[in-house]
Structure formats: C-alpha cells, structure tokens
C-alpha cells in the first residue's frame, strides 16, 4: 500500500542491519539483535546476511548497514556517554573481525557508528576507526552513518564539543556522511572547516 504522495518513498532502501556487535555484557539490552559472543561466527553470519540483502546481481536493490561500529556492547543505560576502553589486541581479535569481513568480503554498502566513545573518541568521529581502519586499511567506499542522535551526544553527553555546530564539524571532518538526527540540519555546510 502506498499513498499517491508517498510513491517515491522507500526506493533504494538501506536496511540498518546486521548488528555485528559482540555480545559480552548481559546488561546491554540489545544483545538479542546480535549473533552472540563469538567474533568468527558473527563474521560468517554477517557476511551471509549482507550477501542476502544486497544480492550478487549487477544492480544493488537494497543496501545493508553493518552496525554499531565498533566497540559497542553495553551497558545500555550508559550508551550515550559510555567510553569503551579496548586494547588494540582486544579490538582486532574481538570487535573488528566481523566489520572487516563485512567490508572486505561482502562489500557492505553502509556502516553505522555507535553512540559510545572508544578509547576517548566518539565512534561517529573516530579518526583511527573511520579513516585509518575502515576507509584506509579495508578500502570501504560506502557511506558512514551515525546512530540516531549520536552526533548530538558529542556535546550533550560525551562533552567533547560545546555546540551542535562543533559536533557536526567534528563528525563531518572525520567522514560521517549521514547523520540520523538533526545536528547537521541547522548548520550551513559552507561555514564548516573541512579538509
């Protein structure tokens, strides 16, 4: 069913799935969305999910979105202010393998950043995770989106910026292409300092 005014809505869908976070903290209220606590199993199931959504034809009819990049698994009540501390060993052995597989094997079209910070930096403006790893090492060419209202968290909860304008600039400068929320809207793109 589609109303006449809605005939152009939902063309070229992006499904914000799969959730390939590693379920390590039972206080996280979204563990049921994941494939569990095993990085290898999560990567295998995630790759097949993306292939199923995106297909293997010449035209992508729907796009998958790997979420929530990258060290996100609770606790739920602190997700907007939490700073996940992860060693490089833990990051590369636990949290990043599924994302790497979805990008390098399944060519996932989109990646969604998490609400939380990882080692002090918001995941939706994390230079190392977004530039060095995702777009650099893995050669990701799709679009990066924030989780809903995650950019607002920069100035309201993480306190890494003071204003929505600073938060938008921080996210855009780091390569966050799409903001699920309204932080980008009141800002004139011509006033931002972009590289």
Where are these regions (language model features)?
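Glycoside hydrolase catalytic-domain context in secreted enzymes
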Residues: 1-192
């Amino acid at each position: 069913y589609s109303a006449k005014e809605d005939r152009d809505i939902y063309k070229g869908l992006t499904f914000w799935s799969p959730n390939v976070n590693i379920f390590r903290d039972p206080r996280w209220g979204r563990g049921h969305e994941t494939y569990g606590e095993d990085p290898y199993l999560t990567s295998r199931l995630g790759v097949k999910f993306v292939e199923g959504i995106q297909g293997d034809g010449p035209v992508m009819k729907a796009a998958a979105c790997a979420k929530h990049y990258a060290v996100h698994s609770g606790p739920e009540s602190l997700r907007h202010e939490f700073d996940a501390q992860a060693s490089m060993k833990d990051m590369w052995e636990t949290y990043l393998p599924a994302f790497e597989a979805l990008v390098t094997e399944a060519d996932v079209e989109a990646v969604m950043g998490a609400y939380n910070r990882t080692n002090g930096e918001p995941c939706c403006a994390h230079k190392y995770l977004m530039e060095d790893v995702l777009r650099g090492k893995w050669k990701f060419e799709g679009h990066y989106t924030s989780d809903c209202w995650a950019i607002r968290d920069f100035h309201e909860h993480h306190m890494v910026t003071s204003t929505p304008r600073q938060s938008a600039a921080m996210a855009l400068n780091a390569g966050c292409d799409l903001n699920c929320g309204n932080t980008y809207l009141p800002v004139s793109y011509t006033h931002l300092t972009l590289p």
